[in-house]
Structures are given as C-alpha cells and as structure tokens.
Amino acid sequence: INMIFASSPFVNADHVLQTYNRNPDKTNLSDFHLDSARSSLIKFCILYLPESNINVNLDALWNLDPELCASLCFALQSPRFIATDQAFSKRSTILQWFPEKLATIENLNNVPSSISHDVYMHCSYDVAENKHWVKKALNQVIRRHLLQGGWTDRDVTKLGERDGKPVMVVLLEHFHSSHSIYRTHSTSMIAARERFYLIGVGNDAVDEAGRAVFDEFHVLEGNNVVSKLDNLKDICEKSGAAIFYMPSIGMDLTAIFASNTRLAPVQVIALGHPATTHSDFIEYVIVEDDYVGSEKCFSEQLLRLPKDALPYVPSALAPQHVEYRLRENPEVVNIGIASTTMKLNPYFLAALKAIRDRANVKVHFHFALGQSSGVTHPYVERFIKSYLGNDATAYPHAPYDQY
C-alpha cells in the first residue's frame, strides 16, 4: 500500500485518512482528532504511511492500544526504502521512542513478528548513536516468547570432538557463490577448518560451492522458526559444539531468534551485516582492525583481526574480463553509485548535491540500484531527482551481468 501511494501523485494516503479526522479544521495536520473506537484506530494505522504529513502522538496511541501501536512502529521501520525526509524522520523518532515501550511487550503473539528482522536490520541505516537499542528490546521480547513456548537452552558443558578437533557450528542466512556473504566470509571459514571441525547449517539454497566450505553440511529442517531452532539445537547437541558462529545476522528470523539462545559455550558473530546484536548470548564479534571506528558501537567483545585477515573472493557471477575505458578531459564526469535502496538517505543525497554544486566540471550521477523495481522504482527515482534533477539517472534493479 505504501509503495502504491508513494509512487503516485498522492505520495501518501492522508486524503483518505481525513475521512476519520474529527477536527472541523482539516487543514491542520498537527491537530488530527481520531475517535477511540478500535476499528478506527486499526484503519488509521493501516493507512498511516511513512510519507504521511500527519503528526501522531505515539504516547496517546500506546495508552489506547500498546500492541497496535507496536505493530504500527514495526510497519514504519520495515520498508527497504526509507530515505525521504518524512520517512527517515519517522523511523528516527521511533528508534528513540520505541525501545523502552517494546521491552514491555510480553511476547510476539500480537505484533507482526514476521517482519521482526526488518526492525532488527534496518535500524542500522539511521544516524543516531543509539540507533541499535531497539535490538536489545526486541531481543528481550523474543527471549520471553521462546521461554513461554517451552524453549530450553542446550547443556553446553557437554562438548565433543570430530577428527580430533573441537566443533564449530555455523548458522547461515544467505550463503551461495553469488551472494555477498560467500564472497566476504567463505575463505576465513575454510581456513578455520585447520583448527575446527566445521558444520554448516542453512537452507536448501546453499549451493555446492557454499556447502564445500564445510566439513559437514545440514539443511535446516522445520516449518517455522521454533522448529528450526529445535533442529539447530539437536545438531549442536549431537556434535558437542564448542563454538556457535553466525557470519551474518539480521537477514533472517532464524538467526535473530538463535542469537537469543544458548547453543554453545562460545557464541560469535561476524560483520556479514555490519552491526552489533545487543544480545546477552553473543560474546564476541569478529572484525578486521581497520573496520573498527569505535568499540562503543558494539555490545560484544571485539576479536580484532589484522587488516585483510578475512580476504574476499569474487562473485560467481562476476565477469571474467572488464574493459576499462578512460576518457581524458570529458565534458561530463560520470559518477557511478552502486547501492541497494535501504542505503540511501537524505544526508547522502545532500552531500551529492553539494558535490555537484561545488564541482568545477559538470558531473552526472548514475545510480545502479538494487531492490528498486516495479512500483518502488518511481518512488526511488523521484527522491533522487528531488536533489539532483537531471544530473542523475536512476537505473532499476537488474540481473547481475547487466548491472
């Protein structure tokens, strides 16, 4: 619904929401009056979109219906594209207000838990120092939810060995030869096999190259997150895992739920998605030394590795040969920007606008966009051109070879 309105001349659904406005002065969107009937609240929340110009009193909405308010906050953080001033400021406001409230929610039964990973991951793209605090609150709710469902942690005093080595169980989110996590973390895990017996656990999309990284690979079985966690715990118990490792966390619900359990005496993440977990069950984060801006960014203890200790490999889809064409003294300097939609924000576009305005030569920005397709693309393109006008071209999502 959000993308349909955002890509249209309407931009938002405020004209529809005015139907529910009890204030005779409908021009003042900062003084929107809504009756307290739950049906009206639900309809309002469905059509209150990231681009809305209506000011919402979150405290008042929380007092009326905490779980409905929490659901709205989940929804406003979930889009992959939150870059305009309106949408970005809404998420920023929620990230400051919501964590304390979210921590009081008893479980996930009456909130949209299926988009929890969006709440978890997308906070990284805000700019506030405390932007990840929402994870700590979400982790508390997830932990309570699991315990209420009968979850028990693994007895991690029972350790085993395979081929004379301690066992490291690795939970994968996305891991195949054309995915970025394979490119960034496969070589270091292959090297880890010198000292550990590596058991990979992931979905059936892990290809032959991905499975070959490990001494042993298991497809994670289960019809829901909890059953998958049970299967994961069973693998850890049978192997006597000493280390539980997640090279990435935030793209999949299973990994986020697993980060709130005890499956091994030592539990570690890496920066496959470059952000802290705020989990009580993750002891360490593996990071190359030159990636550490400030240790204050992490709730975990840092295992700081030398620069280039985690060498990358090319994507399986990368071309074998690239012809580089240097244009001397061009009339227009073309600047390519590769980005998924979630990484765009008003600060970045303002910086590009300043570059264009201050440059001594004419520049043109070419945005090669990931996840910008269908009804989303006109919305993204309008945002980019609102800063750069005809000095930018926004290309929709394309297959890797075309990109």
Regions flagged by a language model, labelled:
Residues 223-231, 392-403:
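Conserved active-site histidine-acidic residue motif and adjacent donor-binding/catalytic loop
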Residues 1-331:
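Alpha-helical solenoid repeat scaffolds of the TPR/TPR-like class and their adjacent stem/linker regions
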Residues 176-197, 307-400:
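Conserved catalytic-core segment of nucleotide-activated headgroup transferases in glycan assembly
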